[in-house]
UniProtKB/Swiss-Prot annotation:
Active-site residues annotated for this sequence: 275
Residue ranges of domain FMN hydroxy acid dehydrogenase in the record: 1-380
GO molecular function, a single term: L-lactate dehydrogenase activity
Protein family: Belongs to the FMN-dependent alpha-hydroxy acid dehydrogenase family.
Gene Ontology CC terms: plasma membrane
Cofactor(s) this protein requires: FMN
Protein species of origin: Actinobacillus pleuropneumoniae serotype 3 (strain JL03)
Binding sites annotated in the UniProt record for substrate: 24, 129, 164, 278
Keywords, in A-Z order: Cell inner membrane, Cell membrane, Flavoprotein, FMN, Membrane, Oxidoreductase
Name assigned to this protein: L-lactate dehydrogenase
PANTHER family hit by this protein: L-LACTATE DEHYDROGENASE, S -2-HYDROXY-ACID OXIDASE-RELATED
């Protein structure tokens, strides 16, 4: 099929990846209203077209936490990413490196930290959940540190699992899930060969290394459910701040007061995020939450944003709302599931070209030029 957008990659991934994995990435929580609004609230923002400005020296590069990025985007942490392509985390990390941006490895990745870092030269980022098992947290932080991970992304919006009803329908969870997955694999032969057979082991590499036994997909949901910690507070993060030498980013901020708390805590960055609509359905979209957060803490802390970004225009919109950079999740997973490393590289090329178009036609030559002036206030029309 012809590929020219994230939507095309989504459709290609839907055809190639079995439903239990496709819908795990594609779905949200409850009725998926926040998932929907993440996309529509961002896409509905009108860009302010300006013309007859010299855009011949247009530049999408930025510096973030001492790293140079070819564009203001980071590949976000996605659990079980290695189930979308053979050793998928490695392929995605290599694609990000080739295109000049960081890759973030999830705590619950298929490929362990050491396998991914051995495959790339650029230091990757590492994401950590708040878990009851502090021994695991310390263990995995030590490994990330030893492997040269540059930035820690600490996810704080999962003190409890979200109610992801679609997973029960798709076979990711629910009755007879093993049989349903096996039948789905039979009807998706390319995936069954490339990932199902040649992509083994299908265990959570970082968790298995700690427990000393294989922790697979069936154990994944149970292990996470048992280890989410609803008692977590800012005080519990202090030992992590003391232990981690590099930049620390708090992911899952939707309220200005929480953003101010992150500044007081000493975090280097925040990610304005609702977990892609996978946690609290009914929460604000990131596009709606971002402006007030930027008003509260812009300049005091680096602001990243995710959830709902489907093209390069959306990146420009997030920057105009106050973000310093963005994180891309579903978009790269669709591309990875559809075409592996080459798909992710092509998707990033598409996003960069779309950014060039948006920046040229809004007359913003550098990323630092993009402000809310790049948007049209439709309420005044």
């Amino acid at each position: 099929m012809i590929i020219s957008s994230t939507n095309d990659y989504r459709e290609a991934a839907r055809r190639r990846v079995p439903p239990f994995m496709f819908h795990y990435a594609d779905g949200g929580s409850f009725s998926e209203r926040t998932l929907e609004r993440n996309v529509t609230d961002l896409a509905d923002l009108a860009l302010r077209q300006r013309v007859l400005k010299d855009m011949s020296q247009l530049d999408t590069e930025i510096e973030l936490f001492g790293e140079k990025l070819a564009m203001p985007a980071v590949l976000a942490p996605v659990g079980a990413c290695g189930m979308y392509a053979r050793r998928g985390e490695v392929q995605a990390a290599q694609a990000a490196e080739n295109k000049g941006i960081p890759f973030t490895l999830s705590t619950v990745s298929i490929c362990p930290i050491e396998e991914v870092t051995a495959a790339i030269k650029r230091p990757m980022w590492f994401q950590l959940y708040v878990l009851k098992d502090r021994g695991f947290m310390k263990h995995v932080l030590e490994r990330a540190k030893a492997a040269g991970c540059s930035t820690l992304v600490f996810t704080v919006d999962m003190p409890t699992p979200g109610a992801r009803y679609r997973d029960r329908h798709s076979g990711m969870s629910g009755d007879y899930k093993e049989i349903r997955r096996a039948l789905q694999a039979v009807t998706h032969p390319f995936w069954a060969w490339d990932v199902g057979i040649k992509g083994k082991p299908h265990t959570l590499g970082n968790v298995s290394a700690y427990t000393g036994k294989a922790v697979g997909l069936d154990d994944y949901v149970v292990w996470l459910g048992e280890n989410f910690d609803p008692s977590i507070s800012w005080k519990d993060l202090e030992w992590i701040r003391d232990f981690w030498d590099g930049p620390m980013v708090i992911k899952g901020i939707l309220d200005p007061e929480d953003a101010k708390d992150a500044v007081r805590f000493g975090a280097d960055g925040i990610v304005v995020s609702n977990h892609g609509g996978r946690q609290l359905d009914g929460a604000l979209s990131s596009a709606r939450a971002l402006p007030s957060i930027a008003d509260a803490v812009k300049g005091d802390i680096k602001i990243l944003a995710d959830s709902g970004i489907r093209n390069g225009l959306d990146i420009v919109r997030m920057l105009a709302l106050g973000a310093d950079a963005t994180m891309l999740g579903r978009a790269f997973v669709y591309a990875l599931g559809a075409a592996g490393k080459a798909g992710v590289e092509n998707m990033l090329d598409i996003f960069k070209k779309e950014m060039h178009v948006a920046m040229t036609l809004t007359s913003n030559q550098k990323i630092s030029d993009i402000t809310r002036d790049a948007l049209v206030d439709l309420s005044k029309l």
